[in-house]
Amino acid sequence: VRRQLAPKKPSRKSSRKNNSLNKNKNEQAGDIGAAILSHRSGGAHGVCKGGGMAGNTSHKGLDFAKAVALNIEIGVSSLAAFDEVNAIAGAKIHLKVETGMGRNGFSDEWPELLSRDLSKVVGVMMHFARADEPNEAQNKLQIENFEARIAELKAKGVNPIRHISNTAATLSNESAKYDMVRVGIAMYGMSPLGRDNNLKPIMKVRAKLVVVKELPAGHPIGYGATVVTKEATKIGIVGVGYADGIPRNAVGAGVTFNGQSAPLIGRVSMDQIAVDLGPNTEAKSGDWVTVIGDNFDIYDWAKACQTITYEITTRISGRIPRTYIES
């Protein structure tokens, strides 16, 4: 992102009042990417104003003119998209090139692209396949391929802004930083390389206890009765479930109430999870708990679900209202 984005409060109202997601408002710059044209311009989480860069655009039919009017520089990875954007007065284009990811980016169309009018090209980019494995030879090979493309552009009179580093490369590869970087998960205060004490997670998911009740020892919990209480205890039913983005296969996670951990028990339901609050808890129906954050952060949930932190952050559904706060 090349310029500051102006944050805005969420515009969508939710009928579910028993949960919320808090993020530092500056996070909005992190998910601009490919979704900006279809989602961010007047979308659910705010309006992009005053510039930025939308990347990874390979297909036609998006409202490129609106993006240009908002002073957004557009990344393209196909000849069809390039021709469409290049025809717009005032457009600024970033070319995405294929260097070894095997996904989108100019490859077979590259020679034909070089025959086009490149006067609106201001940047060139690529994406690493193995940036979270800093010592892999493929990273060096991709940089070499990228440098070859830069040389070809310069031979055509283009001196582009160069950017190739995602979060992993930004944190681990000094040689890959070039003119700017494109951090994603780091804007959430997380690292794909594991916990980083220099980064502070900014996203927190909270929900309310809809029921708190006592159960005797030997009582089954949830679908399939996969868990039975070992002793008399109080369980809390939290108003959030897999329809809200809480993975159904979570094992070993939990919530935080008044600084105390309450482990998840039983299977995650569509709209609810059950947690063991302990026999002496003072929790009551209507109290807030922290589902993601505090004692069970994104890393804990990712481990509990045998997945990556990216999946946990991106799967939080639109049923949960967003609140942006300043720290």
List the predicted regions and their residue ranges.
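Active-site-proximal beta-alpha core segment in soluble small-molecule metabolic enzymes
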Residues: R2-H163, K177
